Amino acid sequence: MQRHVFARNFRRLSLLRNPSLTKRFQSSASGAANTPNNNDEVMLLQQKLLYDEIRSELKSLSQVPEDEILPELKKSLEQDKLSDKEQQLEAELSDFFRNYALLNKLFDSKTLDGQSSTTTAAATPTKPYPNLIPSANDKPYSSQELFLRQLNHSMRTAKLGATISKVYYPHKDIFYPPLPENITVESLMSAGVHLGQSTSLWRSSTQSYIYGEYKGIHIIDLNQTLSYLKRAAKVVEGVSESGGIILFLGTRQGQKRGLEEAAKKTHGYYVSTRWIPGTLTNSTEISGIWEKQEIDSNDNPTERALSPNETSKQVKPDLLVVLNPTENRNALLEAIKSRVPTIAIIDTDSEPSLVTYPIPGNDDSLRSVNFLLGVLARAGQRGLQNRLARNNEK
């Protein structure tokens, strides 16, 4: 009730009755009008003193009990009527103090409008950033305050303006990749798949994948990329639907996140660090100490104890997907010797004859690699869902 009554009569309180504030305000206004070329430091000092005094008056006023402030309000209302100039100045001061109280969160808008029923008055505003050290009024903003002002400005203006549709967001290629049948030449070009290597690094075996040359860079034919990508997606979907093991390989910096998401979608595996020589051709020495277990068609462990022959049996992936075949040539050679089919992104400096299902495209850009990898992972995810749905029907 105390805050409610005080807020309801806050606008009626005439601060012109305070001689010190009136004198300070008039002296500051007259000084600024009579001396247009006044020193800036003197003006800042006068403004700081005025703001400090106003702030102290507001804080002391917010702590005055209701029993003491109501008689003062009644006396103020019972006094003689103010002149037109005084009423105008009082209205301007009331608006100023109201805006100041709202800006500094001394009171909320409902309290000032007389809509709040809170019984206590807050002496200090609630700080959402308790570790923030505010700067003085006559000092420039600190780096923390500038950051918060920019953050507040971004929050207020981020949704302004026109709504843009049909925009390509590269970060969605990892988590929300498109289906293979929804891929178009425009989407491939947006991801930068058409950009090949420099003409000086060209490998002649990729001649059939090249559309042309532009400023010393080969341009890949995206029509062929689209065809090869859909074929590779069918292979990934078929292997995943049959319960095969898919191994994703990418050893360049920044590819790990995409490999993780692809392995999760297909229940496969990935290698994001150096390829260990002999992983496929000498697996008994490389992976002999790894623990093995049996899983059913739903990829759930059966908890059955394996015999020594089953434990020593070599386990190979049913499909190897390579993102950067130029650096992982040894992995492709091991897959050929182990008769493991491979899928790889073939740039204009790569060798397509080492890959079972090549995909012509840019293997240097993370945007391009994540796009192609996301499409393959989405195809594998659909194959996995088909397998699980078929098993649940039985």
From Swiss-Prot:
Gene3D superfamilies reported in the protein's UniProt record? Glucose-6-phosphate isomerase like protein, domain 1
Functionally, this protein is described as follows: Component of the mitochondrial ribosome (mitoribosome), a dedicated translation machinery responsible for the synthesis of mitochondrial genome-encoded proteins, including at least some of the essential transmembrane subunits of the mitochondrial respiratory chain. The mitoribosomes are attached to the mitochondrial inner membrane and translation products are cotranslationally integrated into the membrane.
Compartments reported by the entry: Mitochondrion
A single GO cellular-component term on record: mitochondrial small ribosomal subunit
Question: Can you name this protein?
Answer: Small ribosomal subunit protein uS2m
More details: Present with 6890 molecules/cell in log phase SD medium.
Q: Can you state the subunit structure given in the record?
A: Component of the mitochondrial small ribosomal subunit (mt-SSU). Mature yeast 74S mitochondrial ribosomes consist of a small (37S) and a large (54S) subunit. The 37S small subunit contains a 15S ribosomal RNA (15S mt-rRNA) and 34 different proteins. The 54S large subunit contains a 21S rRNA (21S mt-rRNA) and 46 different proteins.
Broad class of where this protein is predominantly found: mitochondrion
Which chain regions cross the lipid bilayer? Answer: none
Question: Which family does the similarity line name?
Answer: Belongs to the universal ribosomal protein uS2 family.
Sorted alphabetically, the keyword list is: Mitochondrion, Ribonucleoprotein, Ribosomal protein, Transit peptide
Specify the domain of life of the species encoding this protein.
Eukaryota
**InterPro entries (alphabetical):** Ribosomal_uS2, Ribosomal_uS2_bac/mit/plastid, Ribosomal_uS2_CS, Ribosomal_uS2_flav_dom_sf
Instruction: Provide a Gene Ontology MF annotation, just one.
Output: structural constituent of ribosome
One GO process term, biological-process aspect: mitochondrial translation
Presequence range in chain numbering:
1-25
- HAMAP family, sorted: Ribosomal_uS2_B
